[in-house]
Amino acid sequence: MKFLNYYKNYYTKIFDRIYITEDALSYPESKKAIERLSLPVKEVVSAKDIHKEHLNSKTLFITKRKGAAVKSCPGTRRHICCNYLTVDLYEGCTLGCSYCIMKSYLNFSPVTVYVDSSSPIEEIRKIALNNKDRIVRVGTGEVGDSLQFDPLFEMTADFIQGLANIENLYFEAKTKTCFVDHLLEIKNKGNGVISFSINPEEIVLTEETGAFSLKERLDAAAKVVKAGYNLAFHFDPVICEEGWESRYLDTIEKLSVFPKEKIKWISIGTLRYPPDLKEKIAQTERPYLFDEFVPCADGKYRYLQRRRKEVYRKLYNRLRDITNSSVYFCMESNTVWNYAAGNVPGNLPDTIWLFRAIKG
């Protein structure tokens, strides 16, 4: 891929230095990023050797992963989990969303990139082959945006191509950017899914200030579906400010332009946060903190249950009207599922395939 000046300008506004561990030096992804950025580089043995004053998001840290490459979505106690699998490629994000849960545990951390993609690809293949009787979903957007830094390292293409011949596997790259051009020419896309986290433009402007506009994300979605990819969308978090219903229903209408058969799933999740994140959000005086929230069984604060039921039912019903996609709620209780969707996901034809447990 030709590395455009636009990307170089974008990344050099974010980073001003690179740290790299010795065991990551030989990887082509590392060499490519270092050459493209032309920033000062320091070799270290581990993250512990990064200078204290550089422990922030202006530092790009390139390394090999330690421990398991593929993990289960962490889930939360007494809330239904969709058995999604995750791979950490890019850890950390600079898009600056006010509600981001990563603020509670990555606040003083460099953006970390794990360049050894062959190990997780092989592990994912084994898991999928061990679960031939069910669909396996795996993605890279759990602890960072899947595509924000991908034009620099180009690792998502390795996953898409390396997993393309596995029929029961969906590999998902989730983003709030429009950085998809480097993926469009891949010939064998298999069941690759490019997904977009979306919110009404009013929320984007006030709470996702470093992310890309709703229009830019939807324009990127049009590009990838034209190139042959599957799509997914994530309304997460839904923020219930005044006028929320009309704003979210208007945003849902914008999805009607995409082929129904190409949207594989849509998730909805209302705003939630652990106690330590509340303290960080409070420092910025976000207006949504003045709404009514209650601590739930998993320790996170959520809107009152009666309000969540109302939100989920209205958005769920409208999405069911305009799409054939599987629509599910992220980290919600049986009670909310039964009210908003009429049953729990394991008993609904549209979602049963999403919620089957994955074997080893």
How would you name each of these model-derived features?
Residues V87-C97:
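Cysteine-centered iron-sulfur cluster-binding motifs in ferredoxin-type domains/subunits
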Residues G243-F258:
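Catalytic cores of alpha/beta
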Residues I124-N130, H182-K187, L214-A227, L315:
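Structured alpha-helical segments in the cores of large, soluble enzyme domains
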Residues V136-T140, F171-A173, I194-F196, L231-F235, ...:
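Hydrophobic faces of well-ordered beta-strands that scaffold small-molecule active sites
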Residues M1-S26, S256-G360:
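Auxiliary Fe-S-binding modules of radical SAM enzymes
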Residues G144-L147, C178-D181, G192-F212, P237-E241, ...:
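Conserved radical SAM core fold
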Residues T63-C81, S98-S197:
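Conserved Radical SAM active-site core
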Residues M1-N83:
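Flexible, acidic/Gly-rich N-terminal and inter-domain linker regions that tether
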